[in-house]
């Protein structure tokens, strides 16, 4: 179990940073350097099928040749309509808005467990990158909360979002990242024997 927590800590931070920080941010430089290694998949601790491994390696390699800053802007900031918004309540709230009911439930979780959350001013905490990094924090400091957080707050919507992102064409790095994250989350789900409630997606 301790090894599972260590993997959640490692991959929660690594993948969360890729979704949360702009590619030009110095805090993600080391992560991008990791993916630039020709043999990074050999260091990946969660086993993948050979065809899947080859596909993801090729996607990410090709994607790293593109302008990631522009792609990040188009996918996660705008100004055009976002094809796969990175906030949970956009999918879980009937109004398809940020700051929806699922975010309030997440905030209640944070408040009940006295988890101080530092994000950008007025930013919803249910951003995929923030929530992956929060999973890492919990694995490191309060692992007894992981089951509730993952099953009730992250895994309810993240696979749906990641599937949508993986299908957005011509953004190879983020397509590969989404597919890799799907595999990682499924691994966490099975290793922790999580039961995730079925929800209705409004988008």
Show the residue positions of the predicted features:
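Charged, alpha-helix-forming regions
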Residues: 1-203
């Amino acid at each position: 179990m301790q090894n599972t927590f260590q993997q959640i800590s490692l991959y929660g931070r690594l993948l969360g940073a890729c979704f949360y920080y702009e590619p030009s941010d110095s805090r993600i430089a080391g992560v991008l350097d990791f993916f630039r290694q020709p043999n990074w998949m050999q260091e990946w601790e969660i086993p993948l099928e050979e065809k899947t491994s080859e596909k993801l390696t090729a996607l990410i390699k090709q994607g790293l040749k593109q302008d990631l800053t522009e792609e990040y802007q188009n996918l996660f900031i705008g100004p055009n309509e976002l094809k796969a918004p990175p906030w949970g309540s956009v999918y879980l709230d009937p109004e398809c808005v940020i700051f929806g009911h699922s975010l309030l439930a997440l905030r209640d979780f944070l408040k009940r467990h006295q988890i101080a959350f530092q994000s950008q001013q007025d930013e919803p905490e249910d951003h995929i990158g923030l929530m992956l990094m929060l999973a890492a924090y919990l694995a490191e400091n309060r692992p007894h909360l992981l089951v509730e957080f993952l099953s009730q707050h992250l895994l309810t919507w993240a696979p749906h979002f990641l599937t949508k992102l993986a299908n957005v064409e011509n953004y190879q790095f983020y397509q590969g990242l989404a597919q890799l994250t799907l595999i990682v989350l499924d691994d966490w789900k099975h290793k922790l024997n999580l039961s995730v409630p079925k929800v209705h997606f409004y988008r």
